[in-house]
Amino acid sequence: MRYIIILAVLFINSIHAKITSYKFESVNFDSKIEWTGDGLYNISLKNYGIKTWQTMYTNVPEGTYDISAFPKNDFVSFWVKFEQGDYKVEEYCTGLCVEVKIGPPTVTLTEYDDHINLYIEHPYATRGSKKIPIYKRGDMCDIYLLYTANFTFGDSEEPVTYDIDDYDCTSTGCSIDFATTEKVCVTAQGATEGFLEKITPWSSEVCLTPKKNVYTCAIRSKEDVPNFKDKMARVIKRKFNKQSQSYLTKFLGSTSNDVTTFLSMLNLTKYS
């Protein structure tokens, strides 16, 4: 009778064996599966075009498991199989190059005597203890990112957007120089061209306040000129004597008018 009870319990457990949830996610080619289900499972993977299944884990409970070493880093699909006794279930993935998400770049600002350097470090994959930049590598789907940086100067509420040219990039990151002595904050985002359509999150914002006392003001259109004029008028009033103020105020007025005219001409050219 005892053997019959044991067999009955085993039979009941096999009936209730079931994967109740499953999730695959790969960020920077760090690939993991997360699943829930009763009991212990053998987990294997098969890439498209290969007949055999690769054993990844044996007799493991529900949880999160690293499978980075098993899917091919290309566009072929693959399957993940869970087995417990006679119960089997296969989960399909369209391919690592399609599914992988790319994390944000890392931004650094460094001040030099006559300029500031913006350095954007590529997101990287981890292979053991090595950090490998994700940039035009065949084993990482030939992914490379084109970056957009948002600069915020001084007390401005609106950022200035700048697209980084790939000519400014190497296999490790992108570097551009610029000049300002107002506080500047920068954040960057990367995106691929083509059908993969990868877009990273925005990086953490970094800020730098230069030491030199030179004043700048971002002008993107003629609507920004009055703000520039008001700001420079305050600088003239605070930093120069009355005799100099008169000359500099006239010069500021004529310069502001010239800038407004120039920007208006550019706008007409743009829409002509």
UniProtKB/Swiss-Prot annotation:
Q: Which Pfam families does the entry link to? A: CR4_N, IFNGR1_D2
Please verify whether the record's keywords include Zinc-finger.
Answer: no
Q: Provide the alphabetized UniProt keywords.
A: Early protein, Glycoprotein, Host-virus interaction, Inhibition of host innate immune response by virus, Inhibition of host interferon signaling pathway by virus, Interferon antiviral system evasion, Secreted, Signal, Viral immunoevasion
GO terms for CC?
A: extracellular region
InterPro entries given in the database record = CR4_N, FN3_sf, IFN_gamma_rc_D2_pox/mammal, Ig-like_fold
Indicate the family of this protein.
Belongs to the type II cytokine receptor family.
Function statement = Counteracts the antiviral effects of host IFN-gamma. Acts as a soluble IFN-gamma receptor and thus inhibits the interaction between host IFN-gamma and its receptor.
What this protein is called in its record is Soluble interferon gamma receptor OPG193
